[in-house]
Amino acid sequence: MRAQGIRPAMLIVDTVFSSDGVWPDPAGFLADAAAAIRAEGGLFLADEVQPGFGRLGTSMWGFQRHGVVPDMVSLGKPMGNGYPVAGLVIRPEVIAAFGAQSRYFNTFGGNAVAAAVALAVLDVIRDEGLMENAARTGAVFRDSLAGLA
């Protein structure tokens, strides 16, 4: 890209490549990619729509497996457990720069019902031990598949 005079703006990555059949990549490999995009002046967005909210069983967010803190995190599907809600979490310095350079308005932002649903989902994840259940269930599934190999 540099040879063509193209400056990258952002690296957007599903932190576990969950659309590829949830094939576990080596933990930590995204750290170098995040460092590379930042060295070029770009931002790193961790797409947590699929792996987020404890679905991996080891941490609340897939990016935690890589030892990185993203500039932005996209959230979705499990956030509302079927209710339409999504979110974008942005580092304070990134949103401050955006706000200084752009005017922004969102027609559907700040929906109180959607926010209440998302908070209730967080309570259920914590109170019912869903992350721990994902770890147990995932281990049984992996072990069962290994037995077929």
Task: Describe each region flagged by the PLM.
Residues 1-149:
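Conserved N-terminal phosphate-binding loop of PLP-dependent enzymes in the Aspartate aminotransferase
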